[in-house]
Amino acid sequence: MRFSSIIAPVSLAALASAAPALNARGDSSCIPYNIAIAIETQWISTLTNFDTATATNLLAPELVDTSDSINYIAGIPLGSPTFPSAQAYIAGQGAQPPIGFTILGTDVVTCDGYIVLRWVGAVGKQIYPSQGITILKAVQKGPDATVGPTGWQLAEIHTEFNSAAWIVDIGGTCPPPSGNARLLRN
């Protein structure tokens, strides 16, 4: 009995000391939650109410935006960057009409700048809801608000959504596969 009461705490202490340290939210290298939400909000504004000054301040010059959903609709090869730079994002997104956008949830904000959100977009005829998920990657570029919210900017955007619904909503057609190509539900 005495042996196990000594071994258990010593074993736990050894495990704890071997585990990698996690950065607490208060760490200066960790993105504060409120800044992550501000970045998310500003990114959404580039879709719903585009403003060049906001986008320029928000997006790191090395930004890469990838979305096979958008690439399919736009005729860009799948697996390629949708917007390979902040300039390309501003030129492309700035030319698009605003969309409706409802956040279903901000599910993850990591210390190292990842922000994961689920959403529903509304465009055109709004026949079908187009649900999507986006992973934003923010990086610290400075100590203050000279760039991005409090020095943080977006370096990566990864978005996927129901492109079939989007295509129908913008006036295209996207019939489901027929016959044996359909998934069977039991």
Regions found by a protein language model. Give the residues of each.
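C-terminal and inter-domain tail/linker signature
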Residues: 19-186
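Cleavable N-terminal signal peptides of Sec/SRP-targeted secreted and luminal proteins
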Residues: 3-19
